[in-house]
Amino acid sequence: MTQSTPRLMLAASVLALGLASNAGAEPTAEMLTNNCAGCHGTHGNSVGPASPSIAQMDPMVFVEVMEGFKSGEIASTIMGRIAKGYSTADFEKMAGYFKQQTYQPAKQSFDTALADTGAKLHDKYCEKCHVEGGKPLADEEDYHILAGQWTPYLQYAMSDFREERRPMEKKMASKLRELLKAEGDAGLDALFAFYASQQ
């Protein structure tokens, strides 16, 4: 009994040192992104219509959006509170992780005729910035994924832009005004159908 006591104490000391070492270790990208799965799905592919898929998202855009949530520049229901728990370095790690994931377009219904109209409107008003129909592209930078996103999410995001709860770049604002003047809200519905059709 007395001989085993020093061994037990040694084992306990080694275990305590190991726990202390792990507690001070930098969190990995996988650890940081675990909290995202509840809304954005495993590996960044959303299973809920109100949340965007963030797999293969452009890293610069990811960090910019997260910083916007953290500062309050981008309005949100919950993301602002979540973002406050992370540093810029954390955002960069998370961005690198999601960039490496494979994007899976949402499986959803859409109106085929409306999608055909939307494809033409996309080419006219959106393609210059959202190339290849808004798909994620390996060699592009500063892109936002539209193709295959859930339609309700795109509708909510557009509402935020139009009601100035989210900042909009000048080029986008100009093209949106042109689209709405020519097509009205029906033009947006056609665009949403086009993005939904890319599955």
Curated annotation (Swiss-Prot):
Gene Ontology terms: cellular component: periplasmic space
Could you say which residues form the signal peptide? 1-25
Would I find Metal-binding among this entry's keywords? yes
What's in the keyword line of the UniProt record? Electron transport, Heme, Iron, Metal-binding, Periplasm, Signal, Transport
Q: What is its main location?
A: periplasm
Where is the protein found, in the record's own terms? Answer: Periplasm
PTM characteristics:
Binds 2 heme c groups covalently per subunit.
Its function? Diheme cytochrome that function as the electron transport subunit of sulfide dehydrogenase.
**Protein name per UniProt:** Cytochrome subunit of sulfide dehydrogenase
Q: Tell me the organism.
A: Allochromatium vinosum (strain ATCC 17899 / DSM 180 / NBRC 103801 / NCIMB 10441 / D)
Gene of this entry: fccA
